[in-house]
Amino acid sequence: MKKSLLIWLVLGLLFTLYLIIPEPQLPPKDLPDSPKSNLNDDTRHMEDVIAYYTNRYRAEVMPYYLDQMDNSPFLNFALPNIVINHPPEFAETVFFDTKQSYYLEEIVHPFKSTLFVNGYEWENDVFTSKSSRRQYVQEFEGVVYNSKVTLRWINSNPLIRIAIFWAAWGILLTTVKMLIAEISYFFRFIKNNVIK
């Protein structure tokens, strides 16, 4: 029993180490060759939202941000990423209800932070007929761009995530102990009362 408790404690400490390792800088570095928007309609004055006008498409944008999110600044430690591809309609929930979207991907560091990357490529807009797409051309400071990329990041406080983890980890230990005791009792009952 003491060995399993020691394993539980070591695993908990390793996960705590993961939780306290610094994350990549959020917001990430600016998208190269892409002016940052200062328009109210792009960010709605949300502190955790920025937008860029760019000629880069999804195939270039997503690898750029995945590369930004791959490693911790602490000893270049590799962090696990989960990439979730959301339907474009979900952008209205993540950003605001009038957000145009062609793709919406979420880069998640489990139990730590998330970065939403929303891209609107007006020439590929699946919600608008080809003949009507020109009305949604992305123009910024007199220059026409192929797309607009909007980012939203969500961080969590390291102390809060550690407190939640240890509470859940303790509940898991208690639940597993109770489950083992119940299974053990069940087999003893079967052995003593059914099998003779």
Each model region followed by its residue ranges:
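An acidic-aromatic pocket/loop used at catalytic or ligand-binding sites
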Residues: 1-49, 53-196
